Regions:
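Extracellular beta-strand/beta-solenoid scaffold signature
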Residues: 7-14, 35-49, 67-76, 92-101, ...
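All-beta strand scaffolds that present successive hydrophobic residues in beta-strands
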Residues: 1, 19-25, 55-61, 81-86, ...
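Extracellular beta-helix/beta-solenoid repeat scaffolds
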Residues: 2-37, 45, 56
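Beta-rich extracellular carbohydrate-active architectures
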Residues: 2-5, 26-32, 63-65, 88-91, ...
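A short, hydrophobic secondary-structure junction motif
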Residues: 44-62
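A cross-taxa feature marking solvent-exposed loop/turn segments within ectodomains of secreted
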Residues: 6, 20, 56, 66-68, ...
């Protein structure tokens, strides 16, 4: 499957209170956030957002984003879990982390490549845990 969004403050794929298992999916996001704070704290504008106890297992996924505040994969809130295996994550833009978790979400990144280009855009960011 391919998921994409070019709208500001929107996720290409959002998993909330649900479970998803996917192989070979392509997730792309372009566009700047209207609020760097909301992007950093809640995953607004991320390509992939898993939230509110959702679980996402992605194998061989290609996740890319272009834009300020456009994080690649973001997990938010207690009980949320993301598993990325053999994934390729790339972001271009300021404040666009490769992968990020906050509010006690958990993420496992295994045998994957995470690359970022932009100011304040670490490959991995953990906040408010």
């Amino acid at each position: 499957m391919t998921y994409s969004s070019d709208k500001a403050d929107e996720n290409a794929l959002r998993v909330s209170m649900a479970y998803i298992t996917a192989k070979g999916d392509i997730i792309t996001k372009s566009g700047d956030t209207s609020s760097a704070e909301n992007s950093d704290l809640y995953g607004m504008n991320a390509a992939l957002l898993v939230t509110h106890g959702g679980h996402g297992a992605f194998t061989d996924a290609k996740i890319s984003s272009t834009g300020n505040g456009a994080t690649g994969a973001y997990g938010y809130s207690k009980g949320t879990y993301i598993n990325l295996t053999n994934a390729q994550v790339s972001t271009t833009g300021a404040q666009a982390a490769g992968v990020e978790v906050s509010q006690r979400a958990m993420m496992k990144v295994e045998a994957s490549t995470v690359t970022t280009t932009g100011d304040q855009s670490p490959a991995i960011r953990i906040s408010q845990n």
